[in-house]
């Protein structure tokens, strides 16, 4: 089996921040940490970037002109390919209200500025490892060929295997009800 090039093995990080000095600091630190960095200076640009490439992790400033980080996070989470990509807020907003809002909008972590690049890279690596484990577990369940799903307490399906999706589609088909499965 051919070995992947160094570039192919690098984690891809999308950094979304409107401050050039923060973008420069983070780009230098993340690239030195062996990661590939994509940059966006606002929420709309971030949404354009992810339409072309799905990053492994997203670093997102909360305070930006136009669409703020909280709105951007919610818009990113609404896209199925990004549902499991870790989004980490990095901002000067340290009030409990803002931290809670960051998590409520879909963030998995919240780092306050000034940012310590070494601590940030350690956090990124932890979130990346967790995301990989989750992806592997889901892939294994999908490959098992069984009808499995995860639902919220109110009954909304959060995740399902392809076999479960087939059954759910058949159950909601107007020509074939659940009694026809």
Question: PLM ranges: what are they?
Answer:
Residues 21, 41-45, 63, 68-72:
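Acidic catalytic/metal-coordinating carboxylates
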Residues 23, 65, 83, 95, ...:
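The feature encodes the CheY-like receiver
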Residues 24-32:
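Charged docking surfaces used in two-component/phosphorelay signaling
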Residues 53-59:
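Active-site beta3 strand of CheY-like receiver
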Residues 108:
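Short, glycine/charged-rich "phosphate-handling" switch motifs in NTP-dependent
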Residues 114-124:
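C-terminal output helix
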Residues 145, 149-181:
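PAS-family sensory domains
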């Amino acid at each position: 089996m051919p070995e992947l090039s160094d570039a192919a093995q690098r984690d891809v990080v999308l950094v979304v921040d409107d401050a050039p000095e923060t973008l420069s600091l983070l780009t230098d630190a993340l690239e030195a940490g062996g990661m590939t960095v994509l940059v966006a200076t606002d929420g709309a640009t971030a949404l354009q970037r992810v339409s072309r490439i799905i990053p492994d992790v997203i670093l997102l400033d909360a305070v930006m002109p136009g669409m703020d980080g909280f709105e951007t996070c919610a818009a990113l989470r609404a896209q199925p390919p990004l549902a499991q990509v870790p989004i980490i807020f990095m901002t000067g907003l340290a009030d409990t209200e803002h931290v809670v809002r960051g998590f409520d909008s879909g963030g998995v972590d919240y780092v306050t500025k000034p940012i310590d690049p070494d601590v940030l890279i350690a956090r990124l690596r932890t979130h990346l490892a967790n995301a990989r484990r989750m992806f592997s577990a889901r892939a294994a369940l999908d490959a098992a060929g069984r009808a499995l799903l995860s639902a919220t307490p109110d009954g909304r399906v959060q995740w399902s295997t392809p076999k479960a999706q087939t059954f759910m589609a058949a159950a909601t088909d107007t020509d074939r009800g659940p009694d026809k499965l």
